[in-house]
């Protein structure tokens, strides 16, 4: 179903069964598959390919040569009906690739809202990207990676399968991330190691001075105290009882399977 207010360029191919919302814009030479849903006000600039069971929300801008919902690169994939979901108000720049999930990974690749995916960024099968994240040029997420809200991943950075990039993290460019990055942390290098707390980013997002001090104290317990990881976790949990900002650390530890970067 194509809303009567949507614009479809004469050279675009929109297959029967696709749903195109009000005021959406499908530009020259775009291809939209039969199981695709594109929300109100979303713009496909030109030469964009959207395939598979893909749902895109409203007011997104998707630039030329982006490919969304295509068959993933997992060799186990055998054509199962897996999905891609993208939220609202994202900017997906030129040549970005976002692949559909696998049944082994839950069947869904998900991108939230208000994100910026710069040129050539890659979001592999079964990844989850939160809200207000930035993936800079050529940033690459392997399968099953989770990127939490407000995280920034620098250009040319590669993230290993199943890693977690915590909320408000900043990963420097040309890094290789092979373990989980705790929330609020600046990481850099190959393999990425911690370089402190993302204080400037947190200030811009309105964190209180008291909250920043608590986050720094949690970071020191984890990385500067000389304690074992289990000992640091216990003391951080105690700190989280008094400071809600620190709960992000305890929640991260519960999810982490690869262990925090060291």
From Swiss-Prot:
Pathway: Glycolipid biosynthesis; lipid IV(A) biosynthesis; lipid IV(A) from (3R)-3-hydroxytetradecanoyl-[acyl-carrier-protein] and UDP-N-acetyl-alpha-D-glucosamine: step 1/6. The keyword Transmembrane helix does not apply. Its EC number is 2.3.1.129. GO terms for molecular function: acyl-[acyl-carrier-protein]-UDP-N-acetylglucosamine O-acyltransferase activity. The keyword Repeat applies. Keywords: Acyltransferase, Cytoplasm, Lipid A biosynthesis, Lipid biosynthesis, Lipid metabolism, Repeat, Transferase. It catalyses: a (3R)-hydroxyacyl-[ACP] + UDP-N-acetyl-alpha-D-glucosamine = a UDP-3-O-[(3R)-3-hydroxyacyl]-N-acetyl-alpha-D-glucosamine + holo-[ACP]. GO terms for cellular component: cytoplasm; membrane. Its main location: cytoplasm. It is an enzyme of class 2 (transferase). PANTHER family: ACYL-[ACYL-CARRIER-PROTEIN]--UDP-N-ACETYLGLUCOSAMINE O-ACYLTRANSFERASE, ACYL-[ACYL-CARRIER-PROTEIN]--UDP-N-ACETYLGLUCOSAMINE O-ACYLTRANSFERASE, MITOCHONDRIAL-RELATED. Homotrimer. This is Acyl-[acyl-carrier-protein]--UDP-N-acetylglucosamine O-acyltransferase. It comes from Salmonella dublin (strain CT_02021853). The gene is lpxA.
């Amino acid at each position: 179903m194509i809303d009567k207010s949507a614009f479809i360029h004469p050279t675009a191919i929109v297959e029967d069964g696709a749903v195109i919302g009000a005021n959406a814009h499908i530009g020259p030479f775009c291809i939209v598959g039969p199981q695709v849903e594109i929300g109100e006000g979303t713009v496909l600039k030109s030469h964009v390919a959207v395939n598979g069971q893909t749902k895109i929300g409203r007011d997104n801008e998707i630039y030329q040569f982006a490919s969304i919902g295509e068959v993933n690169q997992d060799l186990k994939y055998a054509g199962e009906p897996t999905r891609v979901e993208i939220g609202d108000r994202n900017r997906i720049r030129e040549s970005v690739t976002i692949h559909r999930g696998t049944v082994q990974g839950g069947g869904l690749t998900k991108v939230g809202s208000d994100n910026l995916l710069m040129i050539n960024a890659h979001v592999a099968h079964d990844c989850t990207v939160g809200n207000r994240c930035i993936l800079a040029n050529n940033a690459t997420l392997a399968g099953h990676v989770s990127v939490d809200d407000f995280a920034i991943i620098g250009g040319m950075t590669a993230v290993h399968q199943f890693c977690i990039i915590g909320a408000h993290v900043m990963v420097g460019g040309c890094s290789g991330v092979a373990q989980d990055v705790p929330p609020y942390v600046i990481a850099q290098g190959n393999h990425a190691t911690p370089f402190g707390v993302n204080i400037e980013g947190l200030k811009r997002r309105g964190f209180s001075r008291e909250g920043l001090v608590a986050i720094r104290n949690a970071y020191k317990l984890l990385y500067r105290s000389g304690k074992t990881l289990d000992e640091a976790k216990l003391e951080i949990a105690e700190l989280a009882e008094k400071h809600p900002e620190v709960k992000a650390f305890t929640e991260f530890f519960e999810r982490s399977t690869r262990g925090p970067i060291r």
